[in-house]
Amino acid sequence: MTTTTTKKPHVLVIPFPQSGHMVPHLDLTHQILLRGATVTVLVTPKNSSYLDALRSLHSPEHFKTLILPFPSHPCIPSGVESLQQLPLEAIVHMFDALSRLHDPLVDFLSRQPPSDLPDAILGSSFLSPWINKVADAFSIKSISFLPINAHSISVMWAQEDRSFFNDLETATTESYGLVINSFYDLEPEFVETVKTRFLNHHRIWTVGPLLPFKAGVDRGGQSSIPPAKVSAWLDSCPEDNSVVYVGFGSQIRLTAEQTAALAAALEKSSVRFIWAVRDAAKKVNSSDNSVEEDVIPAGFEERVKEKGLVIRGWAPQTMILEHRAVGSYLTHLGWGSVLEGMVGGVMLLAWPMQADHFFNTTLIVDKLRAAVRVGENRDSVPDSDKLARILAESAREDLPERVTLMKLREKAMEAIKEGGSSYKNLDELVAEMCL
């Protein structure tokens, strides 16, 4: 892992506090550290644990942390510092709260000697409006990171009604460069579209798929079942590709009706399964910390205990998807989950819910024919009989979507090998930070 210059950069990393953003951003940070950079990561106190694995792998000389208090906000309950603890509509309040980190960060940087200032800020695109201002004040390069694909970017940025995301788009396009968690051979036409139509420059680096840097680490919270027990359960499954993994990411909570339909489908299908059920979200009201719970039907877990495993809270998703027993994945089609499923070589069953899930579905299901759609949106309730049939058939190795996905997997793994497109882009990114 070499760069084109002998100087190694000092990079200030500012991730967005939601696991779908934080985790790939830290995976990217690991790759930058491997290339000789010194990194300082800015987080708030309750997000500091995300950095434990990086701390264990890199020396304090090269990996540093800057912990600033989470700015209070009237619409965010006390003690909440991550979006996954809130419903998605709270994102505007999270943006507002995090923008108040501008002044404390400026104060911190102002007290540093010039030799200790970073060469670049690698910040979340979601925070780019105020990160760019900080970078400009200290003549530092601001490079934006988006953990999504170029197709989604090209669709979102082409929409006329972008509401409050318009400021994010503008700030991202005005930053020094853009890094995305995709690989060039997956979507070359869309990478070129973003580069030529939306950016004021050609500095876009596809660096994916960004893979976990340490197996078995806690990458998202607490689990009701230890990863070792999950692994042992999978090891006990006699047939390869016989288990369906069901998970909808860090933000999605199913309604009671959706949960009942899914439970019925799993039971009717007779397939082996692991179902990750999310923690409840806090309401967006600082005076009301009550929660809305998912409702697993009474008696379900007892009836399926010989074939199924229900995990409440965080699940070791990467480990599950890469296990030989797992053959398919019922997913919301969040981009990180798509890449993890692709690398794991499992059949993707798409139930898009919100935001970029629909753009990902267009790319993966409609354009690339590498997944099967089983749900329509956040409000849809699947027919349990139909879903049961799809689940039962999803382990078939001759499904055309599985064959296509495996070809994409080969391209993904080539991209991150030494000499591959994403590998070289990471080298170039680190070199560019020093120029």
From Swiss-Prot:
Pathway participation: Flavonoid metabolism
Variant or mutagenesis effect after changing W335A: Reduces catalytic activity 6.5-fold
Pfam families documented for this protein: UDPGT (PF00201)
Result after altering I148 to A/S: Reduces catalytic activity 4.3-fold
Record-linked Gene3D superfamilies: Glycogen Phosphorylase B (3.40.50.2000)
UniProt binding sites for quercetin: H21
Reported effect, S163A: Slight decrease in catalytic activity
Family: Belongs to the UDP-glycosyltransferase family.
Active site per UniProt: H21 (proton acceptor), D119 (charge relay)
Catalysed reactions, as listed in the record: quercitrin + UDP-beta-L-rhamnose = quercetin 3,7-bis-O-alpha-L-rhamnoside + UDP + H(+); quercetin 3-O-beta-D-glucoside + UDP-beta-L-rhamnose = quercetin 3-O-beta-D-glucoside-7-O-alpha-L-rhamnoside + UDP + H(+)
Disruption phenotype: No visible phenotype under normal growth conditions, but mutant plants do not accumulate 7-O-rhamnosylated flavonols. Increased concentrations of auxin precursors and auxin metabolites.
Keywords carried by this UniProt record: Glycosyltransferase, Transferase
InterPro entries: UDP_glucos_trans (IPR002213)
Annotated consequence of substituting L88 to A/G/S: Reduces catalytic activity 1.6-fold
Name of this chain's protein: Flavonol 7-O-rhamnosyltransferase
Nucleotidyltransferase recorded as keyword: no
Reported effect, S124D: Slight decrease in catalytic activity
Binding site for UDP: Q18, S250, A315, H332, G336, S337, E340
Entry-linked CDD domains: GT1_Gtf-like
GO MF assignments: UDP-glycosyltransferase activity
Known role: Flavonol 7-O-rhamnosyltransferase that catalyzes the transfer of rhamnose from UDP-rhamnose to the 7-OH position of 3-O-glycosylated flavonols, such as kaempferol 3-O-rhamnoside, kaempferol 3-O-glucoside, quercetin 3-O-glucoside, quercetin 3-O-galactoside, quercetin 3-O-rhamnoside and isorhamnetin 3-O-glucoside. Is able to glycosylate the flavonols quercetin and kaempferol to yield quercetin 7-O-rhamnoside and kaempferol 7-O-rhamnoside. Shows a strict specificity for UDP-rhamnose as sugar donor. Does not act on 3-O-glycosylated anthocyanins.
Alphabetical list of SUPFAM superfamilies matching this protein: UDP-Glycosyltransferase/glycogen phosphorylase
